[in-house]
């Protein structure tokens, strides 16, 4: 059932698509994207990453008749009460990654040292057309720099410094970023679950 299984990546974010394809490569699945279908995605109205990922994955699975994998992820700055959180992609109503980074730096201009600690969280939901769904999560701790560093990645990557690596996500290649990142950890949890075939449904079912 596994090798060659068709799975739709339920995201229009090119950066996420790149990282998901790289991370899922060992499974040998045939990965399709939203560009292969004429779909209008639902609004993300969930209060949590899990709710949003489930909403997207279940919608695409039902619409296409194929398993769908959605990623909902974001940055949580502790001193800002967890902002931007589920609003990471539309923080402050800003339209571009650069504008959102500038807005975040402005919100944090009074914060120093330990006050700049943050974490990235990712929740992957794999939903099937029959209604079954599974969730895989990952997170990584870091610090928000006072100015961007690096040219790679997307989103808040130029600001998110990983002390363990001594770099921002934007200073890492895909492979190195996957070793440390929230999305990489969630993907490894999924790979582990599927290494011997699909996990038992009674264990992995999302209620």
Curated annotation (Swiss-Prot):
Instruction: Report the protein name in the record.
Output: dITP/XTP pyrophosphatase
Active site, renumbered: 72
This protein's cofactor list reads:
Mg(2+)
* Biological process annotations from GO: nucleotide metabolic process; purine nucleoside triphosphate catabolic process
UniProt xrefs under InterPro entries: dITP/XTP_pyrophosphatase (IPR020922), ITPase-like_fam (IPR029001), RdgB/HAM1 (IPR002637)
Could you tell me which Gene3D superfamilies the record lists for this protein?
A: 3.90.950.10
Cofactor detail note: Binds 1 Mg(2+) ion per subunit.
Lineage, top-rank taxon, reads Bacteria
> Which species does this protein come from?
Thermus thermophilus (strain ATCC 27634 / DSM 579 / HB8)
